[in-house]
Each structure stands twice: as structure tokens, then as C-alpha cells.
């Protein structure tokens, strides 16, 4: 009999519990948005499709994987430029370290950053339609760091909708 009361109570409370939970599409980093742009880390981004890998040399010495939300992936596959509003690109970066198992190969070491670009041509009209977020350990970098984002994109990839990454089919 007590078990029946537990089930009834659970059934009555379920709508309240689920209503208080954030929807799946809501950011998992609501308390930590990037300065200037207000970009947050989207929920579920680690399940997004790979756009391309990359390797940054020099002082960065990083291996990177760039992923995109479904809207970004469709734009890449169709060759659509400019990217549509709502496209999100995320660069995951790790220190490049030599493989212990295979001489001459390199593997991801410690995670360095998660960098996010969000296309919203109205909200981010002063930065080519893109908002930027750079996170270390899920915490946004400071404002000074974010002030450098668009300048680099504008100087180097203005003719590719300010996006460095090319699709690796």
C-alpha cells in the first residue's frame, strides 16, 4: 500500500520537477557567458558532426577538432556563404603530444580551450554577424581576450564569411 502512495506522489511531482529542468537545447553554461558577446557553451555539442580537424603550430602547438550544429553542417555541405543565422561552430583544442604507442604520431594531450562562434547577423552586426566565446575549463576568458577575436577573423578570412575552417568531406 505504501508503494502505491510513493508512485502517486511521484506522478504528481513529475511535472514540477521536469518544468524546473532546462530544456535540452538550453545552454549548459548559463552562469558563464562570454564578455562582449554573451555566447555560452551549447548543450550536447560533443555529439555534433565533425567539420574538420586542424593543427595549430608555433606557441599554440595544438590539435583541434571543429564541430558544427546541424544548420552549420548543412551550410558546409551545400557550400552556402554567408552562413545562415543560427549556425554555430565550435573548436575544441588540446595540446599536441607525442604518442607513446606509435613513434612519429601525435595525440591530444591536455584540453586547452573551447572556442565558439555563433551566427546572428542582427545581434552581432558590428562583428561580421558572428558572436565569439572562448572558454577554458568551461569558464569564459576575459574581455581583453574576446576583443581580439573579430580582428583576427576580419584580417584573415573576410572573404569566407569570417570563418577559417574549411569542410573536410
Task: Give residue ranges: language-model regions.
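Positively charged n-region of N-terminal signal peptides that target proteins for export
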Residues: 1-4
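Bacterial N-terminal signal peptides
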Residues: 6-16
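Sequence context surrounding c-type heme c attachment/ligation sites in exported
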Residues: 22-29, 34-64, 80-169
